[in-house]
């Protein structure tokens, strides 16, 4: 986690397929450059249970093999996403979320908002070294998910107690990687990021 392509790779005639679950609707995307874009709604759009697919039928029709009808995107496109019973609740809440986004200024406004949050947190991670250390190369950092570790893992219990006391939830990183992961999806206000930064600054001052 914590890695994001800051550019769209040039794949020539080969259709580009992208899982945009984490940053779908977080910034403008030139969809014409992709053969397939897909993403789970549960990051920036709404609750779990819905998946978004954008695809070019001309570039995805020749699979070279037999597919289950449910896995053939052309069937869903031909039936206007009603090939089977849709997850009504997830779709409805996603609609409400997108109405909120529109009132906030749309995807361009989300990009500005998200960049400010990421700059705030990554700035703290870099400034508070060597107590904290980012796990991703600067040029590959994800705007949506910032990952970092403590240089001294023996201090993790003390840091965990501090951020939990501040009302922060789910900061622990993936169990296979360890460390910490701060998710900053569209709905998260910058004030919440500031709470984490304040906790980190307090901890670094005490343990640096």
Predicted feature residues:
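PLP-dependent enzyme catalytic core of the Aspartate aminotransferase-like
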Residues: 165, 174-208
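Active-site C-terminal subdomain of aminotransferase-like
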Residues: 41-122, 137, 206-208
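Solvent-exposed alpha-helices and their adjacent loops that cap or buttress functional pockets
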Residues: 7-11, 28-32, 43-47, 138-139, ...
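Short beta-strand-to-loop capping motifs
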Residues: 55, 148-152, 184-186
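Active-site phosphate-binding strand-loop segment of PLP-dependent enzymes
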Residues: 1-24
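Conserved PLP-binding catalytic core of the aspartate aminotransferase-like
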Residues: 131-162
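A short linear hydrophobic-aromatic micro-motif
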Residues: 131-135, 168-173
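Conserved active-site segment immediately N-terminal to the catalytic lysine
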Residues: 17, 31-42
């Amino acid at each position: 986690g914590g890695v994001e392509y800051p550019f769209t790779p040039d794949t020539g005639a080969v259709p580009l397929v992208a899982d945009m679950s984490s940053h779908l609707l977080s910034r403008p995307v030139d969809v014409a450059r992709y053969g397939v874009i897909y993403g789970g709604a549960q990051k920036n759009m709404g609750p779990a249970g819905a998946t978004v697919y954008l695809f070019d039928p001309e570039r995805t029709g020749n699979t070279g093999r037999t597919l289950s009808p449910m896995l053939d995107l052309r069937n869903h496109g031909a039936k206007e996403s009603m090939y089977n019973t849709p997850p009504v609740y997830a779709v409805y809440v996603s609609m409400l979320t997108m109405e909120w986004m529109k009132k906030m200024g749309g995807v361009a406004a989300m990009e500005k908002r998200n960049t400010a949050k990421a700059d705030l947190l990554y700035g703290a991670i870099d400034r508070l070294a060597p107590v904290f250390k980012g796990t991703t190369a600067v040029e590959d950092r994800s705007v949506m998910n910032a990952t970092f570790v403590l240089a001294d893992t023996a201090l993790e219990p003390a840091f965990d107690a501090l951020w939990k006391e501040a009302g922060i939830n789910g900061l622990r990183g993936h169990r296979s990687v360890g460390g910490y992961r701060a998710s900053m999806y569209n709905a998260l206000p910058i004030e919440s990021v500031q709470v984490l930064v304040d906790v980190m600054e307090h901890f670094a001052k005490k343990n640096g």
